[in-house]
Amino acid sequence: MPPTLRAMVKIQRLTGMRPGEIFGMRVGDIDRSRGNGLWYYIPGSYKTEKFVGKIKFPLGKPEQELLAPYLIGKKSGEAVFSPRTAQAERKAEKRANRQTKLTPAQVARDEARVEQPYRYSEFYNRFSYRQAIEHAINKGNKTLPEDEQIPYWTPYRLRNSAATATEEKIGLDEAQAQLGHKSANMTRRYSKAQLRIREKLARDRQKHNPFDDGLEGERAAK
């Protein structure tokens, strides 16, 4: 799995974000100015925005370390995670693992592709994100014996897994707050409480990265 896609999967699994919230993330949506040890992801567009304004996702140290390399040298409106970056990573890995020298024709072909920067979209969408994960799983399974195959899963599975882990560790209310599950009226009333719970979860991840224990889906993220 390319590092870009791996970072997306891990952040979504840690925070319980919707797929659209992870692949729609822009550099300018990340607030690093609070001085409390947490960053905040404030999506520019959110389905409950008309009721409660900007929804905030507190980001602890594990998420910050995954995000940091993808914020460097980018403008505010640029995608944090881009298919273009993932494709460049795949090409670099393929080149590094290559056993034979490139032929002149292959060099010319690669140079021609470099001159087409818009061949890949800047942003993932729900189809390309799901397909990228499926491709990574299929690729990984080619090297694994049949009894160790990674089962197919979708981006929404990561969100559900995050909520399940939170419910088992802390409670149902905290899991609902992590996902933002409330009616429109209830969301307005409980938005501040949800943010406090999300901050608590982020601070817990500051102390202990759940991936250190081996989370579901981690094999596919390698």
Ranges and model annotations:
Residues 1-23, 35, 73, 87, ...:
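Basic, Lys/Arg- and aromatic-enriched nucleic-acid-binding interface segment
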Residues 4, 124-131, 146-169:
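Short basic/aromatic active-site micro-motif
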Residues 11-12, 165-169, 178:
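Short alpha-helical segment immediately N-terminal to, or the first helix within
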Residues 28-37, 142, 151-152, 170-191, ...:
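Short, polar N-cap/turn motifs at the start of nucleic acid-interacting alpha helices
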Residues 45-49, 87, 172, 179-204:
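Catalytic-site neighborhood detector that most strongly recognizes the C-terminal catalytic loop/helix
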Residues 47-135:
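C-terminal catalytic core of Y-nucleophile DNA break-rejoin enzymes
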Residues 85, 113, 185-188, 200-222:
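C-terminal secondary-structure termini that scaffold catalytic or DNA-interacting sites
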Residues 103-105, 109, 113, 140-152:
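Short helix/loop segment immediately N-terminal to the Walker
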